Amino acid sequence: SICEALGQTNPSLALPFSATLWGWNFGFDYAPDGYRLHASHQQIHQQYALIPATVPAGEPGGGPMRPAFACGDMLQEFVQDYRRHTGKSFFECYAQALAANQRMDGRSDRPADLVVYQDEHVVLFVPKAQTSQWELQLMTRGAVGNILEADTATRDALDRSLHIAMRVLTSLGATLITVIEYSKR
């Protein structure tokens, strides 16, 4: 399997990848010159890519190597800093904060729950501090570092949750939606 090949200790058999890039571009919009799809290549698609640990720093095929970047690297750095400063797991604390959410306006006559959908494998929710309008976050309940590590039940839960997210966002008027994975190394 790919996971076994990625974890191979024999360098001649190991795949040179250490992270994944997984995501969707979904939707279309109307522009004065006609319909446009949500991607530079004008496709509704789902992508899977394996990211190498290093890439050539200069000319292809020669020169020094440098670490490749994946968006999950920033999250990994934050999670490590969080543990170093608090002694706690960020994701465990994040899940606890999500479950114990309270309204910032102090009202008790309105819902305080940020969860859109949840099951035994995942939780889809509105983050307390959104970075963009209508942002939703999807988090696995188990220690799944990337899509390759997800078992069938977790992948099914991810698919179901993403479908729910697309339906919710499009019902609110969203026409162009991007989904990305922040994977571990």
What are these regions (language model features)?
Residues S1-R185:
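HIT superfamily nucleotide-processing domains
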